[in-house]
Amino acid sequence: MEAENLTELSKFLLLGLSDDPELQPVLFGLFLSMYLVTVLGNLLIILAVSSDSHLHTPMYFFLSNLSFVDICFISTTVPKMLVSIQARSKDISYMGCLTQVYFLMMFAGMDTFLLAVMAYDRFVAICHPLHYTVIMNPCLCGLLVLASWFIIFWFSLVHILLMKRLTFSTGTEIPHFFCEPAQVLKVACSNTLLNNIVLYVATALLGVFPVAGILFSYSQIVSSLMGMSSTKGKYKAFSTCGSHLCVVSLFYGTGLGVYLSSAVTHSSQSSSTASVMYAMVTPMLNPFIYSLRNKDVKGALERLLSRADSCP
């Protein structure tokens, strides 16, 4: 098929998770349920943090931002997939695909940055408790979040502008249920060397550096706890870090699983199936991890729900 520049009328074909017609209603019901649970759970976290003065601290400020990003992240892919299943159409427009790639990179990158910032917050709280309020002041907290958005915005924009220069064949098939950046580059007809370089740099920035920051923070935390004589103090410190460690392990564990799945099997079907874990399961489980393991969040949610019940 002759390669041509895609226009706004051109489209890609997202092959999805399965071609079996009997599975489509099951997939629709499953993913709709997961989407609603994710949005509701993360909205409750945001409402609990914003409405309860006890949670107006740096840790919960970052948590509410993480919940907002998770809602945006899952909303980038799932609604389109649900519409496609219901309409029995695999089409996605060229601009729709680029928009999906842009926001996927942005929100996935923000997840990594926020997890690193939250690890730094725990490091300051445990290793420098007397200076915590001075170091983690509202100005610094806001600056950390804004700087993360700024960096992610420009990296995502550069990647999309470079992708717009590529040529594709009309009706190109993408073996995924969303426009995953690497899969889109694989089906391009023109040279993608520069795009791959930018993608690798972005992966290093969004993956390696945040992970290094998280590892450094927790190495300092462990070192500080080793010198702590109070068992109660150690337990309290571990309990404040437990939820964050679970979320970090889930996020990077599922991401690594997707990478290994695609590297070992070379199967697009298994890769897209594994992608469900980090694209949908991780954002869905985050609110449960933080609410079930955190007494402050559980208390705030109970007060929020009791106020809602008391309203006429």
Swiss-Prot record:
One GO term describing the cellular component: plasma membrane
Tissue expression pattern: Nasal olfactory epithelium.
Main location: membrane
Effect of S84N: High sensitivity to androstenone and androstadienone
Coiled-coil annotated spans: none
Record topological domains on the Cytoplasmic side: 47-54, 121-139, 218-237, 293-312
Keywords, ordered alphabetically: Cell membrane, Disulfide bond, G-protein coupled receptor, Glycoprotein, Membrane, Olfaction, Receptor, Sensory transduction, Transducer, Transmembrane, Transmembrane helix
One Gene Ontology MF term: olfactory receptor activity
Glycan attachment positions: N5
Localization: Cell membrane
Regions of this protein lying in the Extracellular compartment: 1-25, 76-99, 161-197, 259-271
GO terms under biological process: signal transduction
Superkingdom of source: Eukaryota
The protein's name in its UniProt record: Olfactory receptor 7D4
